[in-house]
């Protein structure tokens, strides 16, 4: 039997879970939701009542009526709670002993263990959150940058839901026109057709804008990836260490010291930057080094930013020119920063070759002479360039789709609009109506996936137990 969304009924059984990470800390939170949540909280605290939305300082008692902890207990009555059910939270002392003991007491008093994401699932089924807001919650839990949080908070506040509803209303207006005139399509005046085409073009432009701007700004959500490339011993690991301000990679005069990619995280202007120090690119018979070079090329493919380092104290050789060819042919849609290292020594390389290369590149940043020392000197210019890249995307008030599911829904809606234009041009109003209906369905799936619940099950399974 197909698992449809209509078959998913809001379950009022009482669930319990620890909502905070397990381990040593100031507090742990045990969360309850369901019909017995309030009565279980009263049994735990020996209170006759709990005032809604107030923090009550209480002792927590075990089955032998002995106090096992002191905690703050909060009660949120339905429907004005996260799950739209009665919800109680017990904020006990941190660590694992108290929280686990309280969970066991709740189980004995009639609760069951919550499944992963079950609290958020109940919030969705109860109408507290739409699917876009649920995905925003999941994104906030996994977020690794402040800029991503800002985007996800817009989605959590309901901005995407508002956009979906507005688009749906515009499409319904277009659909109503076509439905009325289906039986008299030969008699429809051209002015009405032009009016519908204009309204549909407006919807198409809005959807196309949000789709393409979301594609170009996924790095804000997922983080930027920067790969440092160059032949062996040109200063790649020195740059990584300088950016991180500590000795992460071994720096040696021996060529080929870095044989594998090294990845580290850095936050710039509120955005996450994954820095990949790659193995030097050169011809090699060493099998291990060959694997490292292959990983370097794979890192290039998934990077947004490439920092290419060349040794300015030596003339360019075949390996340098091979790297230039990679920049020219494989990195056209990536930001490129070129560093001519060892600028403290007399310049021997053909600097003009690099300038000519960057002039042909649509996302070239800068070609700079630099002296990368073990004292982390000279890195400020590099940081300024990286801040410039991040700043071009951050701070934009445009709404951004934050998941591949949302992007796919918009893409399918745009495909329906293209087909709708085509059949409208030849006067096929019935086929036009079908395409508009499909378009509405695709748009609405962003917030309310009516077809089946498997997507929801997969999504909620990615949540932690207490969310």
Swiss-Prot record:
Cell compartments where the protein resides: Cytoplasm
Primary location class: cytoplasm
SUPFAM superfamilies attached to this UniProt entry: Folate-binding domain, P-loop containing nucleoside triphosphate hydrolases
GO terms (BP aspect): tRNA methylation; tRNA wobble uridine modification
CC cofactor note: Binds 1 potassium ion per subunit.
InterPro entries reported in the protein's UniProt record: G_TrmE, GTP-bd, GTP-bd_TrmE_N, GTPase_MnmE, MnmE_dom2, MnmE_helical, P-loop_NTPase, Small_GTP-bd
Residues annotated to bind K(+): 233, 252, 254, 257
Pfam families per record: MMR_HSR1, MnmE_helical, TrmE_N
Top-level taxon in the UniProt lineage: Bacteria
Binding site for Mg(2+): 237, 258
Keyword NAD appears in the UniProt entry: no
NCBIfam families: mnmE_trmE_thdF, small_GTP
Assigned protein family: Belongs to the TRAFAC class TrmE-Era-EngA-EngB-Septin-like GTPase superfamily. TrmE GTPase family.
Listed name of the protein: tRNA modification GTPase MnmE
Gene: mnmE
